[in-house]
Curated annotation (Swiss-Prot):
Reactions this protein catalyses: (2R)-2-phosphoglycerate = (2R)-3-phosphoglycerate
Location of the active site: 63
Record's keyword terms, sorted: Glycolysis, Isomerase, Manganese, Metal-binding
A Pfam family annotated for this UniProt entry: iPGM_N
Species, as recorded: Cereibacter sphaeroides (strain ATCC 17029 / ATH 2.4.9) (Rhodobacter sphaeroides)
Entry protein name: 2,3-bisphosphoglycerate-independent phosphoglycerate mutase
Organism phylogeny: Bacteria, Pseudomonadati, Pseudomonadota, Alphaproteobacteria, Rhodobacterales
Biochemical pathway: Carbohydrate degradation; glycolysis; pyruvate from D-glyceraldehyde 3-phosphate: step 3/5
Amino acid sequence: MTAPKPVVLCILDGWGLRAEREANAVALADTPTFDRLMATCPNATLVTHGPDVGLPRGQMGNSEVGHTNIGAGRVVAMDLGAIDLAIEEGSFPQNPALRDFIAKVKANGGTAHLMGVVSDGGVHGHIQHLISAVEVLAGEGIPVVIHAITDGRDVAPTSAGEFVGQLVRVLPEGARIGTVIGRYWAMDRDKRWDRVKRASDAMLHATGEHAPDAEAAVAAALARGETDEFIAPTVVGDYAGARDGDGFFCLNFRADRAREILAGLGQPGFDAYETGTRPDWSAFLGMVDYSKEHDRFMTAAYPKPVIRNTLGEWVASHGLRQFRIAETEKYPHVTFFLNGGREAPETGEDRYMANSPKVATYDLQPEMSAPDVSDHLVEAIGAGYDLIVVNYANPDMVGHTGDLKAAMAAVEEVDRGLGRAVEAVTTAGGAMIVTADHGNCETMVDPETGGPHTAHTTNPVPVILVNGPAGARLHAGRLADLAPTLLQLMQLPQPEEMTGRSLIDA
């Protein structure tokens, strides 16, 4: 029997399953295609959080973690757990890259600028990592300025006051908060350079709103109607900006939302916006590698391990063609993260990235660029590729806004695209796995507070086999099992590095 062609992996980003219908955008939306597939196709559920995806127990998954595990075909130990362990066992203060940073800043008589998300969401960073770094640097007698990035997305929308207060209470002598900035400005990933400029101007040049202290900055923002994610860049107290000889340390460990701000702060020749005169940094450090381009001007405390024989690499090694498609909000996920942290495409790997709409928040345009993604997906299905990976961003990106009606509209748009994909795959004689990388929009109200729920969830996600082998059944598993499943459908052997197991029971 010949292998189906193409084999499609359709990732409905942020589409989780929850039995209760209340505030559940997936259940409340009109989804005839998804409902039909669940009723007629082999299906099961996948775990997307905790140790099953290389995270600490109870820690919700996210798109970086999800796509890394999917592409690797094995459970990948993620940065959060590795850094937590280093702090817990006491090796963090002796990290070689951190020691080098300390030596250079000391030699230049500089201040250490620490930027990181101030929450315990654990998706992009963790407040405890920031606190630990402050303790180490202040303990070395280095003045410390913190650029506190408020979250409100991976945690409750108005919880920044608690986290900033927690940080303030443990600051050692010689450490202070210099700016408070919502992640909307400092953690963009879609080239909205006007936002990034406002964040970097506050850090570099002390321009923006002003507040006497960090807690007052959060309170003033709330009074202006800004929830944590959107707090306008605010200069705290008499902070006057960065100077030559200072060092910069980014505590966030997830690459996609750190790249732009780091480029604006330190990349030589950067010209996406006018930065003004930037300091001659004595040292520029990150928790992890952010990209090969970033490696040219900064070092990493915890370099990424090499993941060999990812799904894309293995398919390419067999001389087969593959196609990756998403809109730009999820560009890194179906490329960089799915390929194990490598930016360059594999041999025979083509890509299409639809431009995400330039709106302030995606509840204003919940369909996002899904119609464009669907058009190019259908075209690719008929173009002779062996493997296609597509990501629909809407359920996650609109779910993050906390707007239930908009999330329902997002889900319905994706369901329309899914319907087109099913028809095209069936016509072509291919097969498709429909799944998600984590949950989000199935929980739009926080059950504890009654307010909007904007974070990911630990709910299971669906996995559906469309137009698969006759008599096939699926069993429950985890994200690492998807690559082996796709390889089985493609009738390719599984590399020994992949320890996941196919979800298909013949």
